[in-house]
Design a protein with these regions (language model features):
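Short acidic-aromatic linear motifs embedded in glycine-rich loops, typified by GG[WY][YF]DAGD(H)
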Residues: 21-147, 156, 161-162, 166-172, ...
Length: 361
């Protein structure tokens, strides 16, 4: 009798669970859920636009990205400060990570970079896996697939530059499944980044460039060649990298012909040099706010925290290719006789150009 009682209870519980599933609307028609995100062309377009959401800094009014509560979107401070060409200075504790030798694994800058890149990875994986359900025509489907795989390659490329090998996920997973161990840096380049970019480059539905489109600045074959060329540089395959960089020009991209300081403005967002563009305006608080940290005190209250690294500056040569020497500059003939301490206080301004409108604010 007791065994029959347990059997009846188990059957009743199963029926109750099944009834709940039948009654529960797991794909509501009045909102976008994971079950219906990729079910129509309209929703697929929204999903593709959503892949770029992670790049945006939504906290412009909270100040620059120097505290964890303000850090949002693409971390330009981190990538600039950790690069060879930049020295970063700040007496603000959250920024110490960027120029201290010892890095804590739980530091918020490291955590943000990890979370930022893997958010793009997992969103791209979702698109790659589910786009076929949206009923798209073949060219649109292939282009969307290329965009998603390009963004995944971009995110893994950035992760690999920072950590030299990371866990690899190429399919949608739950939080509980994020338990894979680190792959080698070479594995990430050869088995993840390069295959994704090859798919983009070989795909006939992926445009050479997006300069003339309404969605200009989106990924293209030219951008894929550029990113793949950088991957080959990390693999020290120099000639292969050079070949890819040559192809960037064949896709319709070119170098900026004007003054460098004039380049970064909304007017030039369709310039041929813009292969995968980030919106920028020199007035802080709109498209960006990194200029508040990069600019000197005479440019709209800049904080003077990001500076050219001295090692990087020493790589410069004269425009004819000969070695640059400070002692050959008029007025600095005795440069070689100065002590390092005396040189440290010397600052040379040559052709200073400032925005009068911003400087007056």
């Amino acid at each position: 009798m007791k065994k029959l009682y347990y059997t009846i209870l188990a059957t009743a519980a199963a029926l109750t669970t099944a009834s709940c599933v039948d009654l529960l609307n797991t794909a509501p028609e009045n909102q976008i859920a994971s079950e219906n995100m990729w079910t129509t062309p309209e929703l697929a377009l929204k999903g593709m636009n959503g892949l770029y959401e992670t790049f945006y800094n939504r906290k412009q009014s909270n100040g620059t990205q120097v505290r964890s509560e303000n850090l949002d979107g693409l971390n330009k401070y981190g990538i600039e400060a950790l690069g060879f060409c930049t020295d970063y200075y700040a007496n603000n504790y959250p920024i110490y990570l960027l120029y201290n030798q010892a890095k804590r694994a739980n530091d918020w800058q490291l955590a943000h970079e990890w979370r930022f890149c893997y958010t793009i990875v997992h969103a791209a994986n979702d698109a790659v896996t589910n786009l076929h359900k949206a009923g798209l025509d073949a060219p649109t489907y292939e282009r969307y697939l290329c965009e998603a795989r390009f963004l995944r390659a971009w995110a893994y490329s950035r992760l690999n530059k920072f950590w030299q090998g990371v866990p690899v996920y190429l399919e949608p997973i739950s939080n509980e499944q994020c338990t894979r161990t680190q792959e080698s840096a070479e594995y990430v380049w050869r088995e993840v980044v390069l295959p994704d970019l090859k798919y983009c480059i070989d795909n006939a539905s992926f445009p050479d460039n997006t300069l003339g489109e309404s969605n200009f600045g989106r990924p293209s074959k030219g951008a894929a060649y550029a990113l793949r060329g950088m991957a080959y540089m990390w693999l020290k395959e120099w000639q292969t990298a050079a070949n890819d960089f040559e192809q960037v020009g064949q896709c319709g991209y070119d170098l900026w012909r004007g003054e460098y300081i004039d380049f970064f403005s909304p007017d030039n967002e369709r310039d041929n040099e813009m292969s995968f563009a980030i919106q920028y305006d020199e007035e802080s608080g709109y498209c960006d706010n990194i200029q508040q940290a990069v600019g000197a005190r005479d440019t709209y209250g800049g904080w003077d925290e990001v500076k050219p690294a001295s090692d990087f500056v020493d790589y410069y040569q004269n425009d004819d290719g000969t070695e640059f020497k400070w002692s050959q500059v008029t007025g600095l003939e005795n440069w070689d006789q100065l002590t390092p301490r005396q040189r440290a206080v010397f600052f040379c301004r040559d052709g200073l150009k400032s925005n009068a409108k911003l400087a007056s604010q």
